[in-house]
Amino acid sequence: MNEYFVNLNIKEMPETMRPREKLIARGEDKLDEAELLAIVLGSGTREMNALELARQLLARHGGSLRFLMSATLEELTAEKGIGMAKAVSIKAAIEMGRRVVGNIQLRRIIKSPEDVQEAVRELAMEEMRHYDREHFRVLYLDRKGGLITMQDISIGGLHSSIVHPREVFKTAVKKSAASMILVHNHPSGDPTPSQEDIEITRRLIEAGKIMGIEILDHVIIGEINYCSLKARGLI
């Protein structure tokens, strides 16, 4: 961004550099991450406009929107220039995007191992690969393989927050699910399963056999790719 425009109000900038006007004229896909974030923020501070605030916020986190996916309100408001109103707007925008994707994908039918991996790629990969903490998510399916719902069971890591069968199967029973797909991410970016990943999966599979609920796969998501424990022959 040209330093000449740093301390200007957005309205004082040339129209071609204003995020909202650029979106209207050229389309949302022509905006970079900072410009999109500036629109969500709505306004800047006394020291900088919304676009510069967005650029500085991203710069503090490696230039990526990744941290916004799992940031709490407390973490957002700890950032310079981000008050509660801006933090709430960010959280609402992230959640709205998540729900749009979720509503589309809930129509999916999953019947084969290939369907499982495709569903994980399209439903969870893009979102979960950006998380900086481990999220353990479960996709619940009906008897025909239809996706009923999905739910994050644990946040914080399999090591610090052990996944208990009770939490995993509570929603399955409530929703009358016939099978499940387990998904979690590795913030390190390497989807290689740990021994603990394998042991937890096998423990959940045994619990599922008792309850008559099949676990179809456990997919671990990394930064670039993913690992299916089923495809690896680990379960």
From Swiss-Prot:
Biological processes per GO annotation: proteolysis
Gene3D superfamilies assigned: 5' to 3' exonuclease, C-terminal subdomain (1.10.150.20), Cytidine Deaminase, domain 2 (3.40.140.10)
All copies of domain MPN, residue ranges: 109-235
Database matches in CDD domains: MPN_DUF2466
Alphabetically ordered keywords of this record: Hydrolase, Metal-binding, Metalloprotease, Protease, Zinc
Motif residue range(s): JAMM motif: 184-197
One Pfam family named in its UniProt record: RadC
GO molecular function, one term: metallopeptidase activity
SUPFAM superfamilies: RuvA domain 2-like
Binding annotation for Zn(2+): 184, 186, 197
Family: Belongs to the UPF0758 family.
Protein name according to UniProt: UPF0758 protein Swol_1642
